[in-house]
């Protein structure tokens, strides 16, 4: 399965490393190159420096062929924008958005975006 992950923080890097280890085709995006140091040694996926809310960056990451999209940065607004682009612009069938404010979950659900947050994990 082809996966794009936006955000190479603790959660994003951990998920990218695990999915790549399981044999999935993983592309992880982050605006800060140093964030990729969190990836497991020998990470077999692709790490791209870029903004996950930029359609040209998502295009370069292969969003048109992607099956799963995870927006896992530390910012709720950035995550929802990236998730909406994944769903609406690229038609990615499975989109998950990390949020820090659980009050936003209902709003995002009306947009067809599934969410996770720390308080529910």
Predicted ranges, named:
Residues 1-121:
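Cytosolic regulatory regions of ion transport systems
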